[in-house]
């Protein structure tokens, strides 16, 4: 059963719970953000700030350790998880166990922003889909990593939200952007039905 929904500003406000005065950061969820590569530091910073701004109580940012200095100088509120960098300047596959362990201790995981498309990141994407049980958001390069084998989504071990723009969606379903924009709802409904994932197709509509 495919369900569609529309949310406006007032709808979202009504969904936000009031926070108790005796609460702490642990009361409002733990988000694990796995982002960045040698030439893509900004997306990790923006994603982390976005998670904090949206209300996540504790945000842990996992990133290739080559980015340690620029990230440390840009963020103050996150818990840092620097990981071994591959020769490509991205996440090394040696980090898989650490990433899966951190995911198991989180309430939600975001993976993909600026991670690059390499054999290592493709393998990590597959591992998070098939071996992780925490709700998972796949964005940007995570989607580019699976566009050659989208069927991996059918092997998922967790709830998944994908957030493609039209270009990324075109690579996932092998259709041109124009045809997607002409039939956005039909395209997304069909994709959700086939792969049983929640899909947010970004755009002005």
Question: Language-model segments: what does each one mean?
Answer:
Residues 1-135, 144-161, 166-205:
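Small-residue (G/A/S/T)-rich helix-start motifs and N-terminal tracts that mark the onset
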């Amino acid at each position: 059963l495919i369900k569609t929904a529309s949310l406006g500003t007032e709808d979202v406000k009504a969904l936000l719970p009031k926070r108790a005065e005796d609460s702490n950061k642990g009361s409002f969820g733990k988000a694990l953000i796995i982002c960045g590569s040698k030439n893509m530091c900004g997306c990790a910073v923006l994603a982390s700030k976005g998670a904090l701004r949206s209300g996540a109580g504790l945000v842990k940012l996992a990133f290739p350790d080559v980015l340690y200095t620029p990230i440390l100088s840009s963020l103050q509120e996150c818990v840092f998880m620097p990981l071994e960098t591959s020769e490509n300047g991205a996440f090394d596959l040696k980090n898989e166990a650490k990433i899966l362990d951190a995911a198991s201790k989180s309430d939600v995981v975001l993976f993909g922003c600026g991670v690059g498309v390499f054999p290592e990141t493709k393998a990590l994407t597959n591992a998070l889909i098939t071996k992780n049980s925490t709700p998972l958001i796949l964005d940007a390069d995570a989607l580019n990593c699976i566009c050659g084998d989208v069927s991996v989504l059918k092997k998922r071990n967790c709830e998944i939200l994908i957030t493609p723009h039209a270009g990324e969606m075109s690579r996932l379903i092998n259709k041109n952007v124009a045809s997607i924009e002409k039939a956005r709802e039909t395209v997304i409904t069909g994709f959700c039905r086939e792969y049983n994932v929640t899909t947010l197709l970004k755009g002005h509509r």
